[in-house]
Amino acid sequence: MITNELKEMPLLIAKIEEWSMVRGIHNLPYETQRYKIMEEFGELFGAYYRGNLELLKDSLGDIVVTLIIYVQQFSNGERNFFEEFWWVDKDEFKGLSYHLDQIATSTNLIYAGASGIWVLRYVIADLKHIAKHYGWNLTECVEHAWEEIKDRKGRVVDGVWVH
């Protein structure tokens, strides 16, 4: 599983960044991406509380997609910026509600403007724990999200990408 992640995640990150650049999303102010991140966090919590595993898996991947683009926006295209902390794990699994609570806290920090890498590292680690709890790895969740968005058409309207 780790071997596949080592091969697949850098490719997925590159595809998502290219997708963002083709659509001009990478040039939008990163502050606007925060709203998309919040939307995806909301979908994650909604899926969890409804017990909708398909939407939960999709939400995990969608969050990572929005974070990849967020990092792309505030890092000014610096390559491998996201990949550097993809492999960070924190602690062991402490229970689903613990990791969801940690994501809720991180959501507030991101919304408040904390773009620091440490926040994103913890979000990724918590997302990994949640995915693992359900028998998935986070890379396959991102792959699932990529398959959903890769052919989407849309445009930037008033600084926001709409599809």
Task: Give, region by region, the residue ranges found by the protein language model.
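Flexible "arm" and connector segments at domain edges
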Residues: M1-H163
